[in-house]
């Protein structure tokens, strides 16, 4: 049950997921949410535009924004969050991969660009 959107994580699976950072900015600005961006497959490190957007958010909102590069997602990490925001294409890939952590994810907002 989604009660709050205080703790949100956003996995970035591909370069096309960069638009999700707009949602991160809005949640920080309007709700003072704490955002964790998960860099899957080194997408942020290898994409100049996404990296700049993440760096800008980290500089402007250092207490609200963090970047995580772990490849393994633990149940404890998922339990700390209220919401996951993911693109439709990445959601499809995640479901197709039958990832172990799917059963433990919090509420999900699936967004199409």
Task: Enumerate the language-model features and the residues they cover.
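Intrinsically disordered or low-complexity boundary/linker segments at protein termini
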Residues: 1-49, 58-83, 88-113
């Amino acid at each position: 049950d989604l009660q709050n959107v205080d703790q949100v994580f956003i996995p970035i699976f591909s370069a096309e997921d960069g638009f999700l950072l707009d949602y991160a900015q809005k949640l920080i600005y309007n709700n003072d949410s704490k955002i964790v961006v998960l860099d899957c497959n080194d997408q942020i490190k290898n994409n100049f535009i996404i990296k700049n957007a993440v760096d800008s958010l980290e500089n402007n909102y250092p207490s609200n924004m963090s970047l995580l590069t772990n490849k393994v997602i633990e149940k404890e990490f998922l339990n700390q969050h209220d919401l996951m925001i993911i693109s439709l294409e990445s959601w499809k890939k995640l479901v197709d991969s039958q990832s172990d952590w799917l059963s433990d994810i919090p509420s999900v907002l699936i967004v199409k660009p």
